Amino acid sequence: MSGVNDIRSAFLNYFAKNGHDIVPSSPLVPRNDPTLMFTNAGMVQFKNVFTGLEKRPYQRATTSQKCVRAGGKHNDLDNVGYTARHLTFFEMLGNFSFGDYFKERAIELAWNLITKEYGLKKDKLLVTVYHTDDEAASYWKKIAGFSDDRIIRIPTSDNFWAMGDTGPCGPCSEIFIDQGEHIFGGPPGSPEEDGDRFLEFWNLVFMQYEQVTKDERLPLPRPSIDTGMGLERMANILQGVDSVFETDLFRSLIDATSSALGRGPGEEDAASFRVIADHLRSSSFLIADGVLPSNEGRGYVLRRIMRRAMRHAQLLGASEPLMWRLVWALVREMGQAYPELVRAEAMIEETMRLEETRFRKTLDRGLAILDEKSASLKKGDMFDGDTAFTLYDTYGFPLDLTQDALRNRGISVDIASFTDAMDRQRAKARASWAGSGEAATETVWFGLREKLGATEFLGYDTETAEGVVTALVADGKEVDALKAGDSGAIVLNQTPFYAESGGQVGDTGVLSGDGVRFRVTDTLKKAGDLFVHFGTVEEGAIKRDAALQLDVDHARRSSIRANHSATHLLHEALRQVLGDHIAQKGSMVAPDRLRFDFVHQKPITPDELRRVEDIANDIVLENDEVTTRLMAVDDAREAGARALFGEKYGDEVRVVSMGKTARDSGSNALGWSVELCGGTHVKRTGDIGLVSITGESAVASGVRRIEALTGRYARQSANAAINTAKQAAAELRTTVDDMPARIAALMEERKKLERELSDARKKLAMGGGGAAGAADGGADVREVGGVKLMARAVEGIEIKDLKSLVDQGKKQLGSGVIALVATSEDGKGSIVVGVTPDLVARFSAVDLVRTASVVLGGKGGGGKPDMAQAGGPDGSKAQAALDAIAAAIGG
């Protein structure tokens, strides 16, 4: 039973036999906690249960929760690979009691599991308790038979857990095992406690108080239990090894890495193998839960993890992208416990392959930029920390690589300014992420949900109904009535109004009754499944228990239905045209338009877009029936129904199928497009009318977006495009059919004229002082300090042409300095400086161009000693910039 998968199963089965519901792991992106970047503990998904804001159909639960600690308060990233126990991804096994059993039973369950099921020896175990928790200490004596020296009292916050400044809290008890004298370390509370000899593997939290204020703590009426055991640490213990990286799961991943590299780990590079194994897990699970690498928020942390692993792969000699070739090994080890890995395998591989390909390019680019930025530094100098962070943040160039590259030249990095820049970026990242569920502060809705129950939704079958007002809310508080002119929210016992979810906007319409009328401007879900109608009272006064007629805006709902069904058709069409890796990342379904976000690593070509649109419209024209059925979630997935990554589904789901034609081998008996969906849809595909894709763009790294119109909106857009084409053809004195050829001919003629104009400008620019091409009659060749200087200001010359002109000038002079400043149409200035070979020892083009750049309002420039370029926003100071160069030469 010592394998990781066996240990996990034994834990869950043990608690199931002891009356606990096995609850699946929640996603790594928290649904109901905007304060967390990633799920980092088993209790996260139960936070609202512990605070009393949410009720579950069970009082005891057990989970194996996937967790990531690589950002924010809990960040183990930099330690991974160099210690025996730190991981960015880990599984937390836990058992929970919500007001059911408490301290004694929790200790008894824990003790029986570790000694009877797992077979740990009592003489190797010891525990800690909070220093004032005599109750827990007495239970450990009673149940485990521990003497006082095996029960260590800890007076610090390590043994007192709190959810925050206020809320549930309580003492905790940690269980340790002595791994043997051959490992350094002392027991908890000793000076050597940070060593690895005494390994903490299970924490039992006894939630028995509520922190009301900083100075007031009251007993909870229904104390609860929250425990967390590190699965990897337990495997470490049961398999008799000294490190989590020596357990069966990690050995398998390290073996896969060795096989891919054609070499095994040595003493000097074992840490790199460990980093790759851990980061493969965290990266893969984050991608499977819908996170993609980017430069902010969660995606920023994922990119850091991935690139750290990829840097270690390069240190091990990997000449080609490596990480994506290891995903199969992870899926083999963990796919059975976490089916989302299997479903997302292709997407994980593609994301990793592309990210590593990009990273290899950025490494080369980063080295080139580092050489340029440090060219003027000498031994003993310090490289600017802000620039080092720009290399890291913008180009993905690790700090340690910057330090290594500069170390041989005797140059150090300003770590203080690098850290300041990093802190600013972390603050930006923390500000950018928001939780995917409701904030726990909306207590009014949780209270109403508990009191009233779920709202019955009638809108799949009707757009009109009668309902009874069960609650009225204004300004976040429940009220007795809403009068004419008041804005507020109404909760009903039942409703045909669809509440915004799954990307579909909420319904609007009218609630009316005897002398009253309420205009619904939006419908939202609160506290899970409480439908809330927001709007304004237009007539009369509405009170609780009033009976009302409920009428959804029919025309608006019809357009929304068409757009929602069209997103399903486009989703399947995209998969057929672009590949099976296509996965939905989000959508917006409004009455007048739709957009659909999906995983894809490159822009979609016009031909691909046309094919997607044609396939979707083929299904529309077939006018097939759209069917919905309720199915068990596992049966629906097995039947091939597509689900949204990270979306929470119940045991029973609504499956929407459309299209009967089997157009590829992936089609199934349920239909051509089959998705789990709670939205409203057309009766037949023909009701969509027409699908017209109006745009395609990138919304994040690896995420594309298409926008489209349907029905009358698509028809109006098409008519407008036709009219525009006719008007353009008339202006060009041709027909619509011949317009492409006419435009091509005009563009070719324009290019010819632009080339002729450019040649004329270049001739004028080098034609001597006072030429028409000079911006202000720029100077001819003159001597400054015994050196020939050709300094001219010109207009309309591009930077690449400036370089060729400077080369010409160097040949004309034979010996001297050439400086040309060009002013663009938007008023910006570009400058190129050239120095002939015989003068390079005296004058550096880089130094001269930087002098001029400052005058133009720029921040420097770059290049080589014989040719350099720079720019600035103020081209009006072109002559002053040239004068600065002359002064530098003469000085």
UniProtKB/Swiss-Prot annotation:
Free-text comment on the cofactor: Binds 1 zinc ion per subunit.
SUPFAM superfamilies, alphabetized: Class II aaRS and biotin synthetases, Putative anticodon-binding domain of alanyl-tRNA synthetase (AlaRS), ThrRS/AlaRS common domain, Translation proteins
GO biological process: alanyl-tRNA aminoacylation; negative regulation of DNA-templated transcription
Source organism superkingdom: Bacteria
Name of the protein described by the UniProt record: Alanine--tRNA ligase
Function: Catalyzes the attachment of alanine to tRNA(Ala) in a two-step reaction: alanine is first activated by ATP to form Ala-AMP and then transferred to the acceptor end of tRNA(Ala). Also edits incorrectly charged Ser-tRNA(Ala) and Gly-tRNA(Ala) via its editing domain.
Alphabetical list of HAMAP family matching this protein: Ala_tRNA_synth_B
InterPro entries membership: aa-tRNA-synth_II/BPL/LPL, Ala-tRNA-lgiase_IIc, Ala-tRNA-ligase_IIc_anticod-bd, Ala-tRNA-synth_IIc_core, Ala-tRNA-synth_IIc_N, Ala-tRNA_ligase, Ala_tRNA_ligase_euk/bac, DHHA1_dom
Compartments in which it is found: Cytoplasm
Alphabetic keyword roster: Aminoacyl-tRNA synthetase, ATP-binding, Cytoplasm, Ligase, Metal-binding, Nucleotide-binding, Protein biosynthesis, RNA-binding, tRNA-binding, Zinc
SMART domains on file: tRNA_SAD
Enzyme class: ligase
Gene Ontology molecular-function annotations: alanine-tRNA ligase activity; aminoacyl-tRNA deacylase activity; ATP binding; tRNA binding; zinc ion binding
Similarity section: Belongs to the class-II aminoacyl-tRNA synthetase family.
Cystine residue pairs: none
Cofactor(s) needed: Zn(2+)
Catalytic activity: tRNA(Ala) + L-alanine + ATP = L-alanyl-tRNA(Ala) + AMP + diphosphate
GO cellular component: cytosol
Enzyme Commission designation: 6.1.1.7
Description of its domains: Consists of three domains; the N-terminal catalytic domain, the editing domain and the C-terminal C-Ala domain. The editing domain removes incorrectly charged amino acids, while the C-Ala domain, along with tRNA(Ala), serves as a bridge to cooperatively bring together the editing and aminoacylation centers thus stimulating deacylation of misacylated tRNAs.
Alphabetical list of Pfam families matching this protein: DHHA1, tRNA-synt_2c, tRNA_SAD
Subcellular location, principal: cytoplasm
